[in-house]
């Protein structure tokens, strides 16, 4: 068979070409979806119903990625972003979308993913719960600010990482951070730039707790006494609980000053008011960033799990006891299991502080089979709140224990959908599913699903 030369497509021309596309929907990561020559095209920054001029940035066999050049026809759900750093800072990616439209999209994306990626049939509308929603702005009670020392200018940058980059975007305020923490950013940056050892500063972790605002400053070297005095004065002026953290993770409290001989630092804490529980935590411990939504989420989890006075409940990936402690007020016994030893120790202390003697915490490898552990025993109900990777390994042995109800809290609907298949194949059905709008202005989806054992 004769062979003829065929010129290969010019990829640089394909990528540089601009074209007009119509957006039909958003994917679960918040990117717009359009079609071009039989390919799906993903376009960040656009909304369903819009026509946009775009430029390809990546071409694959079955899909392409493009960047937005301009909006030709705008959606009624498009709004002006609140933040001057939007699309530079990597924190928010949906500020251009009306808040109610964001929630509708997330709820739809959640249900679609569970239907498509798990073995579930179409999710009936009557088991889709109303989304848990709260304030759209100034909702974050915690943030980590990155620092970068510029040797040329001798200035310290303070801000957030740019999207998909290590570059730091200097910021003056943040509209999703609590107002009191947002107001600290500019004076904090100015203060840190007055230090002699500013090149030795790492990130800054800001936390708004029920007992005040906290700042933990990472340092790579011991600071001179003049810098300590300067930082202490700043903390006193702003009534800020200020701690230093060295490379070994050791914390030193600068303000308020500790009494002579007292080494116990003041820890931030939050209350779960409905359950009259107080949760203390240390820097590095995971806590939900949205306090109001966390309270509503805990309330709904308890309502769905419906703990009874004679039941034993397992809380896997329990953290510092966010669910375990309030569950212990209703159940006969709660067992909390966590993979991070420091959080297990804090959870144990929280149980003591709340005078709860029917909750026990254990440190374990959460990817291992724990069914043979003598402390586990019979489990009546189960609560899971894993990290983004999900709980696939844990469910291999958990489903054999056949708890009557399982409440699965997830920050990744894709791993939630995958894990749902394990439970559905083990005799469970989805009884409730709902969005938890933990992260407004971002594409991130928090969700809760109730599984019930078919009897």
From Swiss-Prot:
UniProt keyword Cell wall biogenesis/degradation present: no
Keyword presence, 4Fe-4S: yes
Binding site for [4Fe-4S] cluster: 83, 89, 92, 174
Enzyme class: transferase
InterPro entries, sorted: 23S_rRNA_MeTrfase_RlmD, MeTrfase_TrmA_AS, MeTrfase_TrmA_CS, NA-bd_OB-fold, SAM-dependent_MTases_sf, TRAM_dom, U5_MeTrfase_fam
Reactions this protein catalyses: uridine(1939) in 23S rRNA + S-adenosyl-L-methionine = 5-methyluridine(1939) in 23S rRNA + S-adenosyl-L-homocysteine + H(+)
Keywords of this entry: 4Fe-4S, Iron, Iron-sulfur, Metal-binding, Methyltransferase, rRNA processing, S-adenosyl-L-methionine, Transferase
GO BP of this protein: rRNA base methylation
Cross-referenced HAMAP family: 23SrRNA_methyltr_RlmD
Protein name in UniProt: 23S rRNA (uracil(1939)-C(5))-methyltransferase RlmD
Gene: rlmD
């Amino acid at each position: 068979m004769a062979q003829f030369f065929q010129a290969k497509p010019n990829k640089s021309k394909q990528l540089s070409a601009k074209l007009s596309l119509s957006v039909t929907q958003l994917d679960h990561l918040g990117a717009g979806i359009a079609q071009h020559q039989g390919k799906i095209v993903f376009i960040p920054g656009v909304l369903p119903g819009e026509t946009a001029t775009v430029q390809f940035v990546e071409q694959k066999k079955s899909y392409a990625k493009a960047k937005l050049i301009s909006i030709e026809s705008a959606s009624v759900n498009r709004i002006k972003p609140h933040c001057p750093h939007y699309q530079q800072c990597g924190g928010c990616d949906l500020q251009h979308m009306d808040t109610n439209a964001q929630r509708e999209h997330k709820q739809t994306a959640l249900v679609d993913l569970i239907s498509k990626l798990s073995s579930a049939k179409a999710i009936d509308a009557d088991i889709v719960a109303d989304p848990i929603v709260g304030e759209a702005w100034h909702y974050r009670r915690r943030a980590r600010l990155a620092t970068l020392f510029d040797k040329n200018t001798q200035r310290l940058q303070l801000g957030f990482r740019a999207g998909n980059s290590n570059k730091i975007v200097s910021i003056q305020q943040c509209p999703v951070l609590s107002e009191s923490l947002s107001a600290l950013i500019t004076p904090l940056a100015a203060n840190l730039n007055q230090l002699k050892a500013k090149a030795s500063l790492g990130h800054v972790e800001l936390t708004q707790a029920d007992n005040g605002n906290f700042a933990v400053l990472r340092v790579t070297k011991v600071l001179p006494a003049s810098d300590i005095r300067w930082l202490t004065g700043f903390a006193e002026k702003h009534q800020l609980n200020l701690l230093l953290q060295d490379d070994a993770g050791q914390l030193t409290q600068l303000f308020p000053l500790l009494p002579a001989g007292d080494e116990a630092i003041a820890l931030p804490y939050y209350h779960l008011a409905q359950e009259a529980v107080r949760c203390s935590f240390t820097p590095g411990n995971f806590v939900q960033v949205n306090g109001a939504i966390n309270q509503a989420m805990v309330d709904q989890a308890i309502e769905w799990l419906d703990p009874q006075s004679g039941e034993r409940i397992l809380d896997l990936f329990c953290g510092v006891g966010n669910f375990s402690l309030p569950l212990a007020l209703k159940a006969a016994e709660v067992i909390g299991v966590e993979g991070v030893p420091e959080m297990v120790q804090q959870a144990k202390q929280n149980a003591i502080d709340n005078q709860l003697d029917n909750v026990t915490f254990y440190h374990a490898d959460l990817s291992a089979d724990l069914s043979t552990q003598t402390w586990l025993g019979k489990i009546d109900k189960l609560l899971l709140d894993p990290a983004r990777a999900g709980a696939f390994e844990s469910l291999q042995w958990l489903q054999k224990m056949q708890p009557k109800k399982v409440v699965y809290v997830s920050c990744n609907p894709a791993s939630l959908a995958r894990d749902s298949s394990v439970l559905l194949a083990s005799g469970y059905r989805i009884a409730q599913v709902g969005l938890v709008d933990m992260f407004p202005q971002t594409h991130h989806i928090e969700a809760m699903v109730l599984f019930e054992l078919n009897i």
